């Protein structure tokens, strides 16, 4: 039995019959994600053990198909994209940047891309961070604001940096009239 503390945990109710991956990904990235190197080291040590059950502090006890869960943790802790796709993350003040980002998402989908739009002013920030790690590409769309970046995007970027965001292709959409500066800040 592996008592894994925060490892292999997930958000959600214990009694709920729900798919494990989405809430476990969000949990990993937002709770454990900064420690990918350490997780990789522990997974290597655990590889030689005969583990029949994983008991995390948060989430269900895992008893079957343990290889599936371990494979997810190997992927997440390596900071490699989990799947091919594009997150379009937007922070719009009056809706114009949002309209441009939604149009970009629509065009990407028309071209066959797996594109997901998230409005950083309204959507769950932890889910947006998890999606940034999930997909191999991210498009950041933000308005310039007081000589910098509109704060919801600034918060999103701070969270990504704090969780060691890496190994992704990033595109920028900047909106500004007389003093555009969001792209400079997003770099």
Residue ranges of predicted features:
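Metallo-beta-lactamase
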Residues: 1-64
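Conserved beta-strand elements of the Class I
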Residues: 2, 85-89, 171
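Cofactor-binding loop segments of dinucleotide-utilizing enzymes, especially the Rossmann-like FAD-
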Residues: 6, 89-93, 120, 174-176
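Short N-terminal or domain-adjacent regulatory/targeting segments
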Residues: 53-82
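Short gly/ser/thr-rich secondary-structure transition/capping motifs
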Residues: 71, 118-123
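Short, highly selective alpha-helical patches that border small-molecule cofactor pockets
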Residues: 97-101, 105, 153, 183
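Short helix-loop-beta junction
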Residues: 101-116
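Helix-loop-strand module that forms the ligand-binding subsite of alpha/beta enzymes
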Residues: 122-187
């Amino acid at each position: 039995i592996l008592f894994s503390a925060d490892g292999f945990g997930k958000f959600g109710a214990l009694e709920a019959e729900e798919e494990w991956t989405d809430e476990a990904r969000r949990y990993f990235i937002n709770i454990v994600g900064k420690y990918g190197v350490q997780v990789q080291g522990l997974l290597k040590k655990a590889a030689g053990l005969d583990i029949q059950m994983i008991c995390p502090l948060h989430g269900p006890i895992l008893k079957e198909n343990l290889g599936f869960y371990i494979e997810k943790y190997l992927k997440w802790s390596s900071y490699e994209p989990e799947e091919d796709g594009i997150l379009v993350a937007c922070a719009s003040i009056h809706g114009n940047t949002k309209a441009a980002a939604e149009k970009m998402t629509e065009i990407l989908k028309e071209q066959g891309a797996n594109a997901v739009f998230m409005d950083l002013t309204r959507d769950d920030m932890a889910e947006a961070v998890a999606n940034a790690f999930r997909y191999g590409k991210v498009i950041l769309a933000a308005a310039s604001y007081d000589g910098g970046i509109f704060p919801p995007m600034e918060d999103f970027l701070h969270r990504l940096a704090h969780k060691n965001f890496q190994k992704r292709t990033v595109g920028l959409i900047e909106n500004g009239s007389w003093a555009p500066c969001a792209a400079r800040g997003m770099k």
